[in-house]
């Protein structure tokens, strides 16, 4: 059995803190020489304990959820309209309905059919699994989300004929709709694929909010991208 070379932390617990029950496992991995790829809100590479331990054992720390640098931040200007590639955005009726998985599956299927496809991630897990470009949008100041997404789409479109973009949350979600709208306006897609869980009534982690359904979501998508 080959030895592991990296530990990937693909879970971001509510509140963003590092659970105490995980610390020993992460320490053991570093002592074994494993790099750590983390999607946590807490940046291991900026904490003395983890930096010191990694240096002692020749391991590297990768904090995927870091904010873009200042030179990557700009307001959207519509330049994505000039790309030659077809852009497909995956949206949903709620959080955690399969937008990222659908985006990745569409990308793989397009490649299998011989299409020149690339994809853009908007969350840490998509970046970890190999998107051509990506950003963790919840780390981007609100004014700049559309511009950052626009740049990522344009970059991938320069090298590919078809670009798939991972969406976040939903336009009808009272907590996160602003992020969804910024991604929609930044990607300005030629087509949208809508993910839905038909039996879901209450929103994930927001049970007082109800899922509004496919028809309302589609109307908003069409109205806001016309």
Report residues per predicted region.
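Fold-independent oxyanion-binding glycine-rich loops
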Residues: 10-12, 39-41, 64-66, 91-94, ...
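Walker A (P-loop) phosphate-binding motif
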Residues: 74-119
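Generic hydrophobic/aromatic pocket-lining and core-packing "Φ" positions
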Residues: 22-26, 107, 180-181, 218
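Short glycine/serine/threonine-rich phosphate/pyrophosphate-binding segments
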Residues: 17-19, 96-104, 128-129, 171-176
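Short coil/turn connectors at secondary-structure junctions
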Residues: 2-5, 32, 56-59, 83-86, ...
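N-terminal Rossmann-like NAD(P) cofactor-binding subdomain of oxidoreductases
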Residues: 1-86, 91-92
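N-terminal phosphate/diphosphate-binding loop that engages ATP/GTP or pyrophosphate donors
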Residues: 107-143
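Conserved catalytic-core segment of NTP-binding enzymes
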Residues: 42-44, 48-52, 63-71, 76-78, ...
């Amino acid at each position: 059995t080959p030895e592991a070379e990296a530990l990937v932390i693909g879970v971001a617990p509510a509140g963003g803190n590092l659970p105490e029950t995980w610390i020993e496992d992460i320490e053991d991995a570093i002592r074994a020489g494993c790099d750590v790829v983390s999607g946590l809100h807490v940046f291991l590479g900026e904490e003395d304990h983890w930096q010191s331990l990694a240096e002692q054992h020749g391991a590297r720390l990768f904090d995927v959820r870091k904010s873009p640098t200042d030179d990557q931040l700009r307001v959207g200007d519509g330049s994505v309209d000039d790309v030659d590639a077809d852009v497909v955005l995956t949206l949903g009726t709620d959080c955690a309905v399969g937008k990222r998985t659908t985006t990745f599956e569409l990308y793989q299927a397009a490649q299998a059919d011989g299409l020149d496809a690339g994809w853009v991630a908007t969350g840490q897990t998509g970046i970890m699994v190999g998107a051509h470009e990506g950003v963790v949008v919840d780390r981007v100041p609100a004014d700049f989300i559309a511009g950052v997404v626009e740049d990522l789409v344009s970059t991938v479109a320069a090298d590919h004929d078809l670009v798939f973009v991972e969406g976040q949350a939903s336009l009808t979600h009272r907590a996160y709709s602003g992020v969804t709208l910024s991604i929609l306006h930044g990607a300005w897609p030629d087509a949208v694929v809508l993910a839905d869980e038909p039996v879901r009534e209450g929103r994930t982690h927001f049970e007082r909010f109800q899922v509004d359904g496919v028809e309302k979501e589609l109307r908003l998508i069409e109205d806001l991208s016309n």
